[in-house]
Each structure stands twice: as C-alpha cells, then as structure tokens.
C-alpha cells in the first residue's frame, strides 16, 4: 500500500499510476468539486485515458456540513423555494418532520454544533471505464455512473441527512455542488440506507 499526499502535478500523477500498474494499492487526494472532477483532473494532467481506466478503482469525494445542535433542535417546515432549490418537490417533505436548531448558548446561537460528512463514491465499472477511454464529457460519465453503479451525489447524500435530522437544506445548498438532477426522495432514501 502506498499513500501519497495530494496529487497536484503530472509527475506525482504519473508516479501514482506507475505504482498502481505494478500492483500496489495507491491512495491519494485531489482538490476537486466531486468524484468526476478527480478523473478529469488526471486527464487535465495529460495522463492517458487507458492508464486511468486500467488503474483507478474508485474515487471518493466528501464535504463537511454543519450539524444541527442537538440541544436546541426544533421541528420546522421548510419553504417551498428551499425544497425546490435542492431538487425536491414540496409534496415530498410535507408530511415529514424536519429539524432545525433554534440557537442556544452551546452552539453560540447558530443552531449548529459539530460537523457531519456527506460523501460521493464512484466505482469504476466497465461502462465507466469505456466512457473514460472514449473521452466522454463529464456529464456523460456522471450519467453512466449514476445509471450503472448507483452513484449517489454529495447533494443527494446531504438531502438524506436532512431528512434524517442531521443537517439542513440550507447547509446542503451552500456546501454541495449541483452536479446532476436530483432523484426522487424515495429513491435517495433507499440508496443511502
């Protein structure tokens, strides 16, 4: 196992690829918007697509969102515009009891205390590898990943965490990229169990 610091340049990327080609598991980091951005960053560094598709197994992305303060949490009904901005319909959440922090001494009257991570994990199956080899655009790779691997976006993971009472739509909107259309809430909740 080889753990590299952040891959910032072509030399480091080539080193990681060469190590992977010789059978080593290589773990590293990128600063990108999402999982597809990690693949595109390698392509931008002029790493050949056949090397990317033959060595990369998966790409993970994460963001930290503020967590609702458990000491001052209270039920609330979100505004329709707030729900629509995350890609849901108001009917999806009308009968749910969502939570929001009122603000207290513990959370410095913000309504939030601590952090919670939202994740996105892209597993490179054959369909995704073929899309990379064909140099398909990011939105096509994302669509293929969503359809064939069940890729859940960070935004969708965040929505599930709102429904489960950990954070708010406001946090999800401010901290996660909108990378594709949000699936129906029922499907998101099934995929994030």
Predicted segments with their positions:
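Short, flexible helix-loop junctions that flank or precede catalytic/ligand sites
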Residues: 1-193
């Amino acid at each position: 196992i080889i753990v590299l610091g952040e891959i910032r340049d072509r030399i480091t990327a080539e080193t990681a690829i060469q190590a992977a080609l010789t059978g080593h598991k290589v773990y590293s980091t990128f600063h990108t918007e999402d999982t597809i951005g990690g693949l595109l960053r390698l392509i931008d560094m002029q790493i050949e697509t056949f090397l990317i598709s033959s060595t990369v197994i998966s790409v993970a992305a994460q963001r930290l969102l503020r967590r609702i303060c458990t000491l001052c949490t209270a039920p609330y009904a979100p505004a329709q515009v707030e729900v629509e901005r995350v890609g849901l319909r108001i009917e999806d959440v009308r009968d749910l009891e969502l939570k929001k922090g009122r603000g207290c001494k513990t959370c410095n009257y913000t309504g939030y205390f601590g952090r919670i991570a939202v994740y996105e994990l892209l597993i490179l199956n054959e369909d995704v590898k073929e899309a990379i080899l064909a140099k398909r655009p990011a939105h096509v790779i994302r669509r293929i990943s969503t359809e064939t691997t069940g890729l859940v976006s960070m935004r969708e993971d965040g929505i599930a965490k709102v429904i489960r009472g950990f954070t708010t739509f406001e946090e999800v909107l401010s901290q996660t990229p909108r990378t594709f259309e949000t699936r129906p809430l029922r499907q998101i909740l099934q995929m994030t169990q």
